[in-house]
Amino acid sequence: MPNRRDFLKTAAFATLGSGIAVSQVLAGESIASTIHINKQGMGGKMKMTFFPYELKLRHVFTVATYSRTTTPDVQVEIEYEGVTGYGEASMPPYLGETVESVMNFLKKVNLEQFSDPFQLEDILSYVDSLSPKDTAAKAAVDIALHDLVGKLLGAPWHKIWGLNKEKTPSTTFTIGIDTPDVVRAKTKECADRFNILKVKLGRDNDKEMIETIRSVTDLPIAIDANQGWKDRQYALDM
């Protein structure tokens, strides 16, 4: 029985030149898309470009040990047959990766040696072999490649993988340490869009943070003190 990678490739080629969308083969229904597979067949080379940029945060982001207003990022674009997939490497300071380290890693990546973007396992194994670290840079290539293949197929990945998007696990929205007024505003901004909140603690206003959030919403709360709690009893009391 062919594996999913081979099935994806077979589905793509089987529908070339026909009036059937690959998404119909995968899911039995039409998925609106402005991207179409090259009807002359697939035989080009992938081209990867990347550039750094700075993501400006809406609010100051404060945890137990530091504050920041920006996050350094590197965007990765993989182009194939006129279709482009996008990925991103985000480098918060505690992960030890920088724009420079990501750029240096990406300069080593040569995707032009691959003529078939559907060879996901081979391509990503090659990327992983270039360094034992550099996980943010590798993730950016991984995301861009999957985005590219999804666009070539004209289907979202939950359809390609046969997943029910209604069963997607809930993710959290993080609220950084701040004054009561700002915490209240942050909570109101996200309370109707997320099912769980993650709250940064680890300073003198921990209880005030929780009380302020509880004055706005009763959503479940997960807490992250970022090594800010040094006393066991204090942690137990919280």
Over which residues does each language-model region extend?
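N-terminal export signals
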Residues: 6-28
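Metal- or metallocofactor-binding catalytic centers and their adjacent structured scaffolds
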Residues: 42-45, 50, 66, 78-79, ...
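N-terminal amphipathic alpha-helix/helix-capping segment at the start of soluble metabolic enzymes
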Residues: 41-44, 63, 155-166
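C-terminal segment of N-terminal export signals and the immediately downstream linker at the start
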Residues: 22-58
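Twin-arginine (Tat) signal peptide motif
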Residues: 1-8, 32
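Short catalytic helix/loop segments, enriched in acidic residues and glycine
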Residues: 70-73
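Metal-dependent enolase-superfamily TIM-barrel catalytic cores that perform enediolate-based chemistry
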Residues: 157-238
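A general lysine-centric signal
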Residues: 9, 138, 198-200
